């Protein structure tokens, strides 16, 4: 049994001039035990101008969260520069390369994923999801953005995570949403 604590689904979208990120509250120990149902995996950073969410090993994610926030301050809130510098440090450090987590970061202008391999990815369609329910949330979000375009970014973020929670056993309905 894998005894690491894991946190799961995060979804983010930029749509109609707004951006929203949603995350569920479930933390799982291994494959069978829910340790916490109300974790807050989506947070505001840098004077509330940046929203970040994590999926993966909880301890690893908090380490990356703290490192990313330090990079944000070091580069005066420049989201892409902070993400790239974090990724460079992540790739270049033997200990950091062992971390099992991913981040989604966004501000009013950009949406990025910082992957577990130290890559920075900007989605083509301003929509992204990570974690065990990520593919379900991403599918729902893309369908809603395409076929229900009058919905707000917040509404799409909510519905996408609800869909993932209905399907993925590692995602629950305790959803936190942050909007910019």
Swiss-Prot record:
Allosterically activated by HslU binding. Pfam families: Proteasome. Its main location: cytoplasm. It is found in: Cytoplasm. Keywords: Allosteric enzyme, Cytoplasm, Hydrolase, Metal-binding, Protease, Sodium, Stress response, Threonine protease. GO terms for cellular component: HslUV protease complex; proteasome core complex. One of its GO terms (biological process) is proteolysis involved in protein catabolic process. This is ATP-dependent protease subunit HslV. It comes from Macrococcus caseolyticus (strain JCSC5402). The gene is hslV.
């Amino acid at each position: 049994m894998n005894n690491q604590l894991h946190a799961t689904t995060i979804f983010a979208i930029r749509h109609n001039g707004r951006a929203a990120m949603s995350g569920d509250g479930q933390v799982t120990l291994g494959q069978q035990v829910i340790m916490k149902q109300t974790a807050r995996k989506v947070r505001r950073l840098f004077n509330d101008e940046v929203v970040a969410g994590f999926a993966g090993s909880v301890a690893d994610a908090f380490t990356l969260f703290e490192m990313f926030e330090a990079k944000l301050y070091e580069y005066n809130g420049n989201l892409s520069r902070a993400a790239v510098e974090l990724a460079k440090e992540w790739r270049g450090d033997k200990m950091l390369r062992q971390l099992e987590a991913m981040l989604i970061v966004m501000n009013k202008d950009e949406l990025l994923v910082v992957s577990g391999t130290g890559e920075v990815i900007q989605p083509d369609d301003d929509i992204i999801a990570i974690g065990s329910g990520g593919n379900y949330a991403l599918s729902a979000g893309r369908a809603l953005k395409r076929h229900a375009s009058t919905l707000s970014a917040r509404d799409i973020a909510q519905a996408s995570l609800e869909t993932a929670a209905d399907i993925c056993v590692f995602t629950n309905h305790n959803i936190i949403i942050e909007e910019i």
